[in-house]
């Protein structure tokens, strides 16, 4: 089984790398599942293309920036649609200024891929769209892990 690790990157601390690393280890150790980590895959693409300053292109060369980010979008959505068995998503303040997480959750729902959403916002602030795209909603990662053990162990 393969989990896609969704959640804020662009406006999250260290692109959400720490929580993704913890979840990757837990999934491997407890369920034998692998992951698609968009932080790692995006960094690999940046390294492969020598595009370490791509964020500056948003101001200096918007078309180049858009073209580059579209390649990252394609890579991420392909991972959700064609490779992932389920999506684990952290919904917190880090997703509110971005758009990728919204798209990943929506496209997973549209393709019938389960979305396990860990919500850290007040429930009344959680978008009805995102709530309705989620298969199950959790208050924290411990609840999510208990559920994953029941489902996949």
Q: What do the predicted segments below correspond to?
A:
Residues 1-153:
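Conserved catalytic or regulatory cores that recognize and/or transform ribose-phosphate-containing ligands
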């Amino acid at each position: 089984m393969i989990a896609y690790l969704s959640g804020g990157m662009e406006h999250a601390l260290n692109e959400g790398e720490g929580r993704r690393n913890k979840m990757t280890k837990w999934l491997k150790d407890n369920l034998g599942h692998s992951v698609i980590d968009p932080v790692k895959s995006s960094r690999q693409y940046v390294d492969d293309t020598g595009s370490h300053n791509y964020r500056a292109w948003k101001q200096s060369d918007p078309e180049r920036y858009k073209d580059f980010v579209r390649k990252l979008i394609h890579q991420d959505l392909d991972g959700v649609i064609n490779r992932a068995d389920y999506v684990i998503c952290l919904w917190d303040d880090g997703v509110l200024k971005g758009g990728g997480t919204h798209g990943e959750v929506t496209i997973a729902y549209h393709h019938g891929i389960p979305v396990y959403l860990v919500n850290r916002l007040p429930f009344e602030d959680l978008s009805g769209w995102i709530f309705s795209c989620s298969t199950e909603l959790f208050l924290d990662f411990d609840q999510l892990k208990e559920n994953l053990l029941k489902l996949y162990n």
